[in-house]
């Protein structure tokens, strides 16, 4: 099944609401069930496994009660140029504006109120996985849309994580 997504510009941010997200998934599931009925004349009532393709970029920040702190910021936003440039200089590694770390760092640079309350942030793909499985994790492909990956370890690049942490510590001390 599929669903035609259309984000909206809300207060200068390209976003989808949580209702858009779940409505889109329901629409895709209904489309898949109708396709199964059409092709095989079978009512779909049980699925052994299912996969979703969702955005591996963007920014969904959550607080201690697992509440969304700010509207979802999609890959389409170009509001993170300052963060992207500063992270490139620090890491000597291209950090596209759509990456989650660019969104987080831009929120930090902007002094956005929600940053102090973040306990977890992820992409749309990570959010859907978490909501369907209860697990807050990403596959390596989706994780590569959040932060640079160390391919040999199949994890985030620890040197760059340390540089990011130092950047934030330096910013707080000035």
Give the residues covered by each predicted segment.
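A short small-residue
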Residues: 1-13
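Phosphate/oxyanion-binding active-site loops and adjacent basic polyanion-contact surfaces
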Residues: 17-25
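Glycine-rich phosphate-binding/catalytic subdomain of phosphoryl-transfer
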Residues: 12-15, 27-173
């Amino acid at each position: 099944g599929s669903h035609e997504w259309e984000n909206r510009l809300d207060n200068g941010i390209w976003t989808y609401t949580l209702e858009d997200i779940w409505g889109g998934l329901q629409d895709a599931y209904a489309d898949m069930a109708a396709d199964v009925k059409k092709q095989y004349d079978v009512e779909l009532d049980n699925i052994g496994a299912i996969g979703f393709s969702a955005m591996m970029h963007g920014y969904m920040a959550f607080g201690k009660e697992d509440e969304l702190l700010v509207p979802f910021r999609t890959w389409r936003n170009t509001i993170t140029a300052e963060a992207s440039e500063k992270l490139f200089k620090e890491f000597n590694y291209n950090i596209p504006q759509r990456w989650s770390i660019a969104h987080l760092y831009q929120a930090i640079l902007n002094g956005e109120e929600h940053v102090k309350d973040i306990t977890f942030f992820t992409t749309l793909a990570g959010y859907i996985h978490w909501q369907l499985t209860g697990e807050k994790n990403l596959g390596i492909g989706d994780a590569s849309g959040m932060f640079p990956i160390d391919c040999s370890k199949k994890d985030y690049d620890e040197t760059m994580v340390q540089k990011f942490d130092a950047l934030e510590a330096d910013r707080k001390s000035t």
